Structures are given as C-alpha cells and as structure tokens.
A protein has these predicted regions:
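Helix N-cap at the beta1-alpha1 junction of Rossmann-like dinucleotide-binding domains, i.e.
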Residues: 36-39
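N-terminal Rossmann-like NAD(P) cofactor-binding module of classical short-chain dehydrogenase/reductase
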Residues: 71, 77-81, 102-103
Length: 410
C-alpha cells in the first residue's frame, strides 16, 4: 500500500490534494499535514472515501522532534514537500530519519536569499543512496516539466540544440490591476534581482531588466518580456550541461513595474532586516505579508497563461526552431480547484512525479531531477492529470534587445 505524507497545506495543496484524490489506485492513503489542522481537515471531509483514506496531522517542520514523531507513527512511503523552499533541507532530513522517499516542486532557496542553492540538495545524494531511498527535487512545472521538455527536445525534436529560451508570458488579468497572478515574492524577487543566463559553460549576470524581448505566443499574442533570474536556469544548466545558452524571459504588467519602482526607491524591496521596536524584519517580508495574497488574486483571475520552451538548433544541418508549451485557463483552474493556474501547473507535475515514484518508474537511489529519466512516461502522465502540452513547429523568433526599460512592460 502506498502511503503518502503531504507536508504543507497552503495554496498549492488546493490543487495537489484533489489530484492525489483522483488517483486512489496509486495513493491508497494520504496524510495531509500543516500548521493549520483545521484547514487539513477540510480535505479529509471532502476527499476521504472507501477507496482512499485521508488522515490529517498538525506539523511545524521547525519542531524537529514532534515532526519526526508524527511522521514515524504515520510511516509513509513517500513525502511530498509543499512547505516553503527554504525548508527543503529539513524535510529531506526527516525523510532520511523515517526512511521515506522524497519529492518537492521547488529547488532550495535559503531564507533571505534571491538565488537557489541546488548543490545543497545534491549534497544529500550519498545519504539517500545509503538508505536505498529516492529523492526527486524540482518536480514542479518550472523547473520540472521544463527539464522534461528539454530532454524531449534533445532526443526527439532536434539533432542539436544551440539555444534554449524559457518564455513565461505571465498573462491574464485580475481585480488588482497593479498585481500579477504569480506570487508577489516571486515577482518582486525576479524584477529586483540581476538577470542571469547560462552561456559558454557558466552562469553570467546582467543588471535588472536590462535585456528586453518580444514574443508572439500561441493564443496569447505578442508581449513584452524581460530576461530575469529563475531557478530553472540552475536546474537545466546542471542537468543538461550540453546546451550552450539558456535564458529565462517573463512578462510583467506596466502598472506592477511602476509600483515596484516606487517601493524599491523607498527601500521596501530590501531583504536586509531592520529593527522595528526590537523586532528584526526585512522590508520585503513585511511587504509580502500586507499585500493581497495569491489566493485573493486567483479568485478574480481571467484569461490564459502560457509557459513554453523555445528551442533553437538544427535538423540534418538545417536551422530549426520549435516551441514546446502549455496553456492554462485561470478561471477554469479556480472553478475546478479553487487554485491559481500557476499552482495547478505545478501540482499536475508534482502528482505525476509522485506517480512515477510509487509505481517504480523513478526508482533510483540518491538525489535526482526528472531530466535524468526518460521524459515520455512523465509527459504522458502529465496529460493524464489534465495538463496538456503542444509543440509548435516553425516557431516565431524571440526578438531580443539590450537595455530594456521598465516603461516597456505591458
């Protein structure tokens, strides 16, 4: 019997738990745990059945002893980590103690940092090997599905690849014209930090928003984009090192950019803690707490968002460019799951990865990313979970220009 422990009952659980509940043949028993047991209990009431038992538990991953006791009592085969990414290492430690396989959606980003530390998770490789356990890291959409897209493109679409551009249209509207549909902390981090790209075997940085581009995305249209930092660059450059150039471009509303410029000018995007009546708090952390949360935005989001991988290379010596992409409707996701389109995309990837682990298709001791496995079974499972993808042959060019400006946002 496959017993799954889900750690974290935040916004992403809104899509993960329903998707797990649709697969009782693979997940016979689920324990939903989080800091709010009341919230966990709502999933038990809604989804527990004769075919699939759901139990709940309170968990504070920072309380090591109580968390370990709870996990040992439940004795899961697999732990799905939905906690904030800065807690990844603590959850990995837990899996080693209770001898359970591990799965997360986001790479480890130390608290207060703007960059992921993929090597910190890979440092656990030998420990998981010694225990005979599998740990799959970065199994969301981005990274995750994007890694599979890269592997698929290299094996099936092109003979050689010279350039990979991740294009996140970040599209759709909501009732807050100055806010994006993606998490506030993610968007703020991306536009406040230096842009990064992988080229000639190393990662280089450029000033924030200094590289602009335009792209015509299927069913969305032509939008302005900026090259930004993203953990998928670390993932792809590590797992697919033969790719000469890897970049990440994302779109932002002009009103959002204007708001962030003002906040940045007055110091509110700083990650350096300041003393307020004896309490140490980073301005960015405070800002994130007082701004509307993604749950509020998802309820009013409309339109579609699209993310794709534009691969440039050659087939039989002739230049070829193709776009592998996914499109998701904001309203449809909220009506079905009460979740954002972004969370659904990551949830579908995560549950597909969980399926790969419990069925033995991803049984490999140590710490791995999904690009180490044949991408086609995973992509097939992704479609079964409701997230389709398409391939656009003869894809349009990405129009890139240096020295972008914030005024060039949508």
């Amino acid at each position: 019997m496959n017993r799954v422990l889900v750690i974290g009952c935040g916004k992403m659980a809104r899509a993960v738990i329903p998707l797990l509940a649709r697969n009782p043949e693979f997940f016979r028993e689920i324990c939903v745990s989080g800091r709010s047991k009341e919230k966990c209990d709502t999933y038990k009431k809604k989804y527990s059945s004769d075919k699939q038992k759901i139990v709940t538990a309170f968990v504070d991953i920072n309380n090591k002893e109580k968390t370990r006791l709870m996990a040992k009592i439940y004795n899961p085969d697999l732990v799905i980590n939905l906690a904030p990414s800065y807690l990844n290492l603590k959850v990995m430690d837990l899996c080693l103690e209770i001898e359970a396989n591990y799965l997360d959606a986001s790479l480890y980003i130390p608290k207060g940092s703007t960059q992921c530390d993929i090597n910190a998770e890979y440092a656990y490789d030998q420990k998981f090997r010694e225990k005979g356990l599998t740990a799959i890291i970065g199994c969301g959409f981005n990274p995750g599905v994007m890694n599979a897209f890269g592997q698929y493109a290299a094996g099936k679409l092109l003979d050689e690849i010279s350039k990979v551009d991740i294009i996140d249209m970040n599209a759709g509207t909501n009732a807050h014209p100055y806010l994006m549909n993606t998490p506030m902390n993610t968007s703020l981090r991306q536009i406040s930090s230096e842009g990064r790209m992988f080229t000639d075997g190393k990662i280089i940085s450029v000033p924030p928003l200094s590289v602009q581009a335009k792209y015509s995305f299927p069913e969305i249209g032509k939008r302005n984009l900026f090259m930004v930092d993203h953990e998928v660059i670390d993932a792809l450059s590590t797992e697919l090192p033969g790719m000469p150039t890897i970049r990440y471009f994302s779109g932002f509303k002009r009103t959002f950019m204007s708001m962030v410029k003002v906040l940045r000018d007055v110091g509110m995007t700083s990650t350096t803690p300041v003393d307020i009546d004896g309490q140490q708090i980073a301005p960015l952390d405070f800002l994130y707490e007082v701004m509307p949360q993604q749950d509020d935005l998802a309820a009013t989001a409309k339109g579609k968002t699209g993310i794709g991988m534009l691969v440039t290379g050659a087939v039989e010596g002739e230049k070829k460019q193709e776009l592998i992409y996914a499109l998701v409707d904001h309203q449809q996701c909220y009506e079905e799951f009460g979740a954002s389109a972004t969370d659904f995309m990551s949830a579908a990837a995560l549950v597909s990865g969980a399926n790969m682990i419990v069925t033995g298709q991803w049984k490999q001791d140590g710490v791995h990313m999904i690009s180490e496995f044949d991408p086609q079974p995973f992509l097939k499972e992704l479609k079964r979970q409701g997230l389709d993808y398409k391939v656009l042959e003869e894809a349009p060019d990405l129009e890139v220009s240096e020295h972008g400006t914030e005024e060039e946002a949508e």
